[in-house]
């Protein structure tokens, strides 16, 4: 089994920078990392992040309209298409390189691309007709934003959801105490340094989104912890 380690995070933060040659962007952009993200995730996390992403996949089988925000290279997207042959999916992703990676993944897996609409847009500026999606997915994405940005983003996404929508999210977390907390803090410090340098990430630290989801009318139905509590998968349901 692969375990996150501060050493692996530090190597990612410092050793990988020299390999990425594109100029920096003044605003948050993952363009410089798109071609490298797959191997970076594999080295850093093995299959753990994908296990987090797909923990509650079975709950998506009856959904019809899905909103995937910050989907990246499409690892969750292909699994969603496999388990739900009728779902229509909107993927909002700011990075053109990530969209290209996701489209190539769909082609390799020979999945029905006609059921997927890619929209290249900053999530903070994206808008949708209210009440359209019965599934919202934010995997390893909300950790990119500061508290005041989440306060704007989450209600905006919730507005696009139906009254019976479910919200799946996977992300990192900081355990409450002990060596697990210190370990998570060391890893996250390295990760935020790396992504701030490489992507102009706006956030400097992790903001739990729970209170914003609750204020938007969602209730935590289930949470699974991974890797000594450093990662989690959540199932949120709208209370109606």
Label each residue range with its predicted role.
Residues 46-63:
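Conserved alpha-helix/loop element of class I SAM-dependent methyltransferases that forms part
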